[in-house]
Amino acid sequence: MATPWRRALLMILASQVVTLVKCLEDDDVPEEWLLLHVVQGQIGAGNYSYLRLNHEGKIILRMQSLRGDADLYVSDSTPHPSFDDYELQSVTCGQDVVSIPAHFQRPVGIGIYGHPSHHESDFEMRVYYDRTVDQYPFGEAAYFTDPTGASQQQAYAPEEAAQEEESVLWTILISILKLVLEILF
């Protein structure tokens, strides 16, 4: 007789834990961020969905892959960014976050790519306006110069470019291997 009550109590506790976790996920957004939009969608493997952002200022895109793996590509020079034509990207498994600087030309193109490792991907993207004001929007080095000229910083990190190229190559290689395996079997 106590077993059904224990099961019911465990179910109630489990639902409370799930609710608490969901609340904590939503609360980890800084107070300075203002939620503008919530976009939900579904994307097929190897396909793109495109969105356009017209809001001015610093914008934060937080996309969660609910099922599968959706990747995020952003550009202010093309309305259809892709994995080989973008300015900003986030290609993680799970939550993707991209911070769009205020100086990006509007409209900003947003490409959501369904990774080929999953037949379909469901995603939810939250668009936030960041109300914080950068004291030095181009970095402190842009405003204060060393009179001796001894400290020159490189604006471009070659390690990052090599890592991005490597990521694209791995994606292409995996896609080719899947295609070969699909043909053989």
UniProtKB/Swiss-Prot annotation:
Keyword Protease belongs to the record: no
Annotated keywords: Apoptosis, Glycoprotein, Secreted, Signal
Residues annotated as signal peptide: 1-23
Known glycosylation sites: N47
Pfam families: UPF0669
Cellular compartments per GO CC: extracellular region
Localization: Secreted
Source organism, top-level taxon: Eukaryota
Protein's GO biological process: apoptotic process
Protein role: May be involved in induction of apoptosis in CD4(+) T-cells, but not CD8(+) T-cells or hepatocytes.
Family stated for the protein in its record: Belongs to the UPF0669 family.
This protein's name: UPF0669 protein C6orf120 homolog
Organism whose genome encodes this protein: Mus musculus (Mouse)
